[in-house]
């Protein structure tokens, strides 16, 4: 991939998860060099410019002698690399390297080209500085985590390479790379940015997009296992409140349910007036998550194309301006909203699991076991689901409403965006498990059906049964859950269901008007 002005989520994932190599475009090199020229001119003069020839934070009024400018940048990195906690996952660090290089390549930071090239060299070699997960307050950007990232460039700290954590200097030498000797402004440019929260958001957003599609599939499977009505998902119903997300979710539900033999079998005579909200209101609940994901993708697209440094260099005029582009609030607020939206996918999924396991609601054997009492079936699977849903409620508390002033009150409002982003990552992981539990239960519920489900649901059900057998007697089925969860996370289960829809003949017509009226009267 050629790194220039444009970077999208698909490209980000291709690099961070699939190892696509990255190089700077010629235009990016030129932009970087022009901004560097401005810094070199400043160094030759005596005008105090923040972060170039002054101290940092509360020390902004301390002017630094020209002979100490390189030491100033070195000191900045080593003093700020004070993060704690478990190391960030490899994919998160890859994302930080890519996004920092992307921001610097826009040509408003004043670094030399070789600094950006070293970032990309580490990324392409998958030689990843060890970055602790805790220590960012989200303004000025992700200072401590990015300082740990920068340590690797100057040959300090540790780098994980080929499965081993080793001193950075040793890994650089093995790769034939030289540690960079930071010059004026370069240390500050490396650590002033939102790349930790940006990387975490990008990864979580991608996973949440897959998660939403799978949540729609799980809901459709539960609707079929529970003899639920399809009528609330029809365009005339959802179209009366046409939020984009609700329309999109309803359309996908109709695709998964098309061709069902189950729905026509219970249009009348089952005694139900309407389904529970967790079945009937899936377009509205999942649709709200769809809308939140769409907004997050818009915010992320802007962030990918942004310069989050301070001060900013304007090569056309030679101006150097202190601004607030480093502040993480645009991301933090978006992430907090996404936390709630994704957590709700788990909350409603757990309620659908209850609809499957409770015989008073489902008409199916209690806990989906044919021999209850001796066997407990899926009873405790719901406990796990409930525990994770409850945990998500705590994690969903907004981090961006909190702020603790830092740097002697010079930096008096911060975003806590990285904290929110780490919470979002955990929420996504928890919901992946909650939905896997629903899918296990829904597949078991379909085992009691004699008719075929909608094409997408049926394909997913049959695929699940290739690696998870029907539960006839109690067994240790955590491995089954883990395997199914893996298929969910990879997106393979969703692809199977979607492929069945695209390869199928045109969906069958809805029942004749008389049947449709009966369905509306008895089930809506």
Swiss-Prot record:
Example of a GO cellular component annotation carried by this entry: cytoplasm
Principal location class: cytoplasm
SUPFAM superfamilies linked to this entry: L-aspartase-like
Disulfide bond entries: none
Record GO terms (molecular function): histidine ammonia-lyase activity
Keywords: Cytoplasm, Histidine metabolism, Lyase
Family stated for the protein in its record: Belongs to the PAL/histidase family.
The protein, known as: Histidine ammonia-lyase
Organism: Deinococcus radiodurans (strain ATCC 13939 / DSM 20539 / JCM 16871 / CCUG 27074 / LMG 4051 / NBRC 15346 / NCIMB 9279 / VKM B-1422 / R1)
Lineage of producing organism: Bacteria, Thermotogati, Deinococcota, Deinococci, Deinococcales
Gene: hutH
